[in-house]
């Protein structure tokens, strides 16, 4: 497409998003000190930061659901390379007090074979971890699909899982096709393709519906899953850059009143989110009123956002998560 034929995209200022607390039987009743939230009846296992039902909290679109906003303004939010009008990423915190089911996610091809819009590749950034915390990630080298099937049938699947110790600050990549399970002992910031397609392989006899045949079909014996070493650059630390998303730590100079936030590359702008893993910040621009980012809060930065500066209000650990379009690169 030539530059002359590109559509005119309206500017959209950054905005805060209200979190959504999602019930999970394996979650926690009390999310303090992470969030000032105590569950009424059912435990909370996930805090969705960018779910379709999350509400826009600030700006001219305050009160709308995030899903509705994506339907109404796909180009302003996602940029000129948007391939559809839906939200590309689901970002959430995960709080587990017991082992989650062993599961596997399909890739785009397999998900679409069974009528889904896309597969699910994801990553976990470890916000906190107890000593000896682990996750199950992938299969041991000598495991075959027949071993997996027999392990499901006789309750010994866990013996085939690769157990990965995790520490605060680890970025764990979980590509589609990787058998995995989150275990208790850590708090994870998950970034995933926006998809609810999960094939449950094994659930320790707890009665949840299993998808054994599809999970076996989706399983890859060898994947790229694992802890990704960070790439330290002068203006940011790249925790991961994948086909679907990038996750970066952004330093903010506390010796200055504010730091102008640059995009992660000179390519076509895309949607990104700013998450305060700790501390708080304020973003400001001549184009919009100052916007505060509280601890564990999130701000959406549309592709067509004006340039702004970030001020560290104390103890800021700033994470930027950006959508990627497969095949486009950055």
Locations of the language-model features?
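C-terminal amphipathic alpha-helical segment
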Residues: 199-271
